[in-house]
């Protein structure tokens, strides 16, 4: 009898890991989905705005969720530079600094260059992509591929595309901001076109100009950027690499203009739903988060009226308000310090749970591939 009981305990001990403690699936691809300023309240408001009900966004149905602290070094409230640097390098830095350590002094002194998740992917031979509906040298996309002490140095940021530290650099880069980027470079006596020619990397002025079979392409537009088309085009190109890929897609969810910001977040969520059908989730990690939160609050309202009822009248009386006060919503036009949502599905998503520093997202992505820093 004792022998039988001992045997049963051994069997249970062996079976337990298989019952739910198994290792997370290893990822081939990682897609980082970044809603800039898309805090928890903004995600909630987007659902109420888009569907007149809570919990209707696709990302709100994902099985693995957590909350991420976004505080930078030396402050409670983060900007996009410090917030995204923490996510893609695993190290916190100061506001205004892009993928350099906190020893940097903004605009005055370089700090320690930090290795980004994109650079790890490049080093391993994966394909890489960066897409944003904000200027492609703005702090969030820039943190993936550049190291500078001042986020406003757009020309210097862009030229780092042509001098990669690992691999052959970003394969797919799509976004707006062309005029301002070229102006920034000219003020710093930098020649973008000459650098592009020297590296044999043409810079297209629209997505339509990109050759349909291109594995590597840079497209920087002036206006009319289509995030949906850009993301699908990038996935088509990056998926050709049998080793896998890293792709960061950013959408502007700032709600200083509530109508525009919430519309963009609803549209981004729909795009994410489409992306999930285009990839194999058994080998792809989808990771949704924000670089920082924003001071938006749903303070009233009822289901029989649109969330933004009264906004047009408010705008008519306050043409350029920093703050918005309507029956259901209040917005103070600034970043805020509360935690932001982290949601995940696919390979390695099990690592997303509970409260975490934003630096942990870097570790989650790295671990999904089975890599170590």
What are these regions (language model features)?
Residues 1-5:
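Positively charged n-region of N-terminal signal peptides that target proteins for export
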Residues 7-15:
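Bacterial N-terminal signal peptides
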Residues 19-22:
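Boundary at the C-terminal end of the N-terminal hydrophobic targeting segment
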Residues 27-29, 35-85, 94, 107, ...:
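A post-motif C-terminal structural segment
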Residues 94-111:
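His/Cys-centered metal/cofactor-coordination and adjacent catalytic loops
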Residues 113, 117-119, 123-142:
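Glycine-rich phosphate/pyrophosphate-binding loops
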């Amino acid at each position: 009898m004792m022998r039988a009981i001992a045997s049963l305990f051994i069997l249970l001990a062996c079976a337990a890991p298989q019952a739910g403690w198994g290792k997370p699936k290893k990822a081939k691809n990682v897609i980082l989905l970044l809603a800039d300023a898309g805090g928890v309240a903004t995600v909630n408001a987007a659902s109420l705005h888009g569907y007149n009900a809570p919990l209707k966004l696709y990302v709100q149905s994902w099985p693995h969720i957590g909350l991420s602290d976004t505080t930078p070094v030396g402050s409670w409230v983060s900007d996009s530079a410090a917030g995204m640097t923490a996510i893609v390098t695993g190290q916190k830095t100061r506001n205004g600094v892009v993928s350099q350590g906190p020893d940097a002094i903004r605009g005055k002194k370089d700090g320690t260059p930090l290795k980004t998740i994109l650079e790890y992917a490049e080093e391993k031979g994966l394909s890489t992509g960066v897409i944003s509906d904000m200027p492609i040298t703005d702090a969030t996309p820039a943190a993936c591929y550049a190291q500078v002490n001042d986020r406003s140095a757009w020309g210097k940021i862009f030229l780092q595309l042509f001098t990669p530290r690992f691999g052959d650099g970003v394969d797919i880069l799509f976004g707006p901001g062309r005029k301002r980027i070229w102006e920034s470079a000219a003020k710093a006596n930098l020649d973008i076109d000459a650098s592009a020619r020297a590296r044999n990397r043409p810079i297209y002025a629209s997505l339509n100009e990109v050759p349909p079979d291109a594995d590597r392409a840079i497209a920087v537009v002036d206006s009319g950027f289509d995030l949906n088309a850009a993301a699908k085009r990038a996935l088509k190109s990056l998926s050709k690499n049998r080793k896998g890929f890293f792709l960061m897609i950013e959408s502007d969810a700032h709600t200083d203009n509530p109508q525009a910001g919430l519309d963009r977040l609803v549209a981004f969520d729909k795009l994410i739903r489409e992306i999930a059908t285009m990839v194999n989730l058994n080998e792809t990690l989808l990771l949704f988060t924000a670089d920082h939160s924003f001071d938006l609050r749903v303070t009233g309202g009822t289901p029989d009226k649109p969330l933004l009822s009264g906004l047009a009248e408010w705008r008519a009386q306050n043409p350029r308000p920093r703050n918005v006060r309507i029956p259901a919503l209040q917005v103070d036009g600034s970043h805020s310090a509360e935690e932001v949502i982290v949601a995940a599905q696919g390979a390695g998503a099990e690592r997303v749970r509970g409260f975490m520093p934003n630096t942990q997202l870097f570790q989650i992505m790295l671990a999904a591939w089975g890599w170590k820093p």
